[in-house]
Amino acid sequence: MKHFIGNDWDHVLAPVFESGEYHKLHVFLKKEYQTKQIYPDMYHIFTAFKLTPFKDTKVVILGQDPYHNPSQANGMSFSVMPGTPLPPSLRNIYKELYDDVGAQPVNHGYLKRWADQGVLLLNAVLTVPYGQANGHQGKGWEMVTDAAIKALSERGQVVFILWGRFAQNKIPLIDQDKNVIIKSAHPSPFSANRGFFGSRPFSRCNAALKEFGRAPVDWQLPPNTEA
């Protein structure tokens, strides 16, 4: 079995990692990293899976692809590297977080505290070329992340938080008899006022986890990234 991640995700995703299609993706990415500026750096591609093992995952917040500017992408959806200014979508997430559960905003965008509690911060596409949003869409990452979504859905008792049309296109992969879907507009400034603000995804998520008999997420982030 190939060990790309280093936890139980390697077993869950083994049929994908051992496929010819994944080998093609691997060859493509090797050339991309050699010839272009690709984000995140190679060592952070699987960060979301590394921080949140399959057995511990109880929430999925699904993004589209990584941030495509320097010093932003860190392998977790919506999260940015320590010391990086907050992207507009994340500012809006923090605003809703405060309005929903009273979590105090912080001046960093490093969401590891959530990942450590079982929140899989998953982008559907795990890499992106500099300045080219969706530049690696359709190159093969979707077979990996779709397989992860399906495996979690089959196991059940997962809350899927789906913001915007792209994320909601994954709904057919999810068994809604065994899981909970929380959906709304995307937190982007272009759409946040059309249904993201006031959607209360964080309290609704914890209510669903309580119904599953699982511990709620403490959404309050530490004031600094070392905490």
UniProtKB/Swiss-Prot annotation:
Gene Ontology terms: cellular component: cytoplasm
Major subcellular location class: cytoplasm
Broad enzyme group: hydrolase
Transmembrane annotation, as ranges: none
Keywords in alphabetical order: Cytoplasm, DNA damage, DNA repair, Hydrolase
EC number: 3.2.2.27
Places the protein is found: Cytoplasm
Catalyzed reactions per annotation: Hydrolyzes single-stranded DNA or mismatched double-stranded DNA and polynucleotides, releasing free uracil
GO molecular function, one term: uracil DNA N-glycosylase activity
List of catalytic residues: 65 (proton acceptor)
GO BP of this protein: base-excision repair, AP site formation via deaminated base removal
Metal-binding recorded as keyword: no
Family that this chain belongs to: Belongs to the uracil-DNA glycosylase (UDG) superfamily. UNG family.
Role this protein plays: Excises uracil residues from the DNA which can arise as a result of misincorporation of dUMP residues by DNA polymerase or due to deamination of cytosine.
Protein name (database record): Uracil-DNA glycosylase
